[in-house]
Amino acid sequence: MSVSFAPAHSASPPNTSYIALAGPTASGKTAAALAIAEHVPVEIISVDSALVYRGMDIGTAKPSAEELAAVPHHLIDIRDPLHAYSAAEFVLDAQRLIAQISARGRLALLVGGTMLYFKALFDGLDEMPKADAAVRAVLAIEAAEKGWPALHAELAQVDPVTAARLAPNDSQRISRALEVFRVSGQPLSFFQQRNASKNIADNAGGTSAATLISLEPTDRAWLHGRIAQRFDAMLASGFVDEVRALRARGDLTPDLPAMRCVGYRQAWEALDGTSPMSELRDKGVFATRQLAKRQITWLRSMPQRRVVACDDPTALEQVLDLVKARTDAFQ
């Protein structure tokens, strides 16, 4: 079998400057971004793997029409839910947009919580086998016959490093790891470790053109309360009807990346009858809390970040002070 690889992408060019505003879900990123926009001529680049999809507005907490009109936004509503959007595509799009925004005399403000996108932009992407639809289809058939735990056991034989950090039912990541091995003959962990070594060598003595501001809670209970409030608001705004309309299209399945987004997966299962509708709220809140936990873990692996406690009453002022120190355009 011939092996084709996605092109390697380096981190953002050193002659570009931008500010990144990251944080877990419900940490107040949108409010902070709009506050920055009141003082600096910015254009916002969304760093959110769910906001790229059209027709997924309520469950993704997509910015309102008024918010989108107040400040130029990019990488929102650029894909149909039927089509996936990768970290490699994000890096190419973000680099292009950062350069274009800079050429317009404005500052690119990257805002979101998809940490894989941030990491890919900061550290670059090494060569990785391209997605292979045929191999993925075979894996889906095998999973239907044997179950994902069986495929997880197979992965443990060929890539124990990756298997050790994946749950036996993590279908998306197990499928990708086995796909990489079957296409290339090398485990996914091989490519990831090589990439890490390459980035250490490339970045030694270098400086980042980005300022990374990270909104992180000092009190998890505060964040959990906001998550519950937001999910309740989504349900009250017609989230279930939104998912029902997506299902009614007939061409979407629960295995698509778009439908695996937190909240959408739980709502789909409830509409399918595989999970009681009465449990949707609790399951959705729990899944969102787990997502926030993973996001915070990612953020803590980024030593260059400037942390602002999002549960501090002066959080917005602190964010603005960091931005003011970074740009002469602050007004």
Curated annotation (Swiss-Prot):
- Broad class of enzyme this protein falls into: transferase
Q: Where is this region: Interaction with substrate tRNA?
A: 48-51, 172-176, 260-265, 293-300
Which InterPro entries does the record match to this protein?
Answer: Dimethylallyltransferase (IPR039657), IPT (IPR018022), P-loop_NTPase (IPR027417)
Assigned EC number: 2.5.1.75
- This protein's record includes keyword Chaperone: no
Q: What does this protein do?
A: Catalyzes the transfer of a dimethylallyl group onto the adenine at position 37 in tRNAs that read codons beginning with uridine, leading to the formation of N6-(dimethylallyl)adenosine (i(6)A).
Q: Which HAMAP family match?
A: IPP_trans
Name of the protein? tRNA dimethylallyltransferase
Organism encoding this protein = Polaromonas naphthalenivorans (strain CJ2)
Give the gene that encodes this protein. miaA
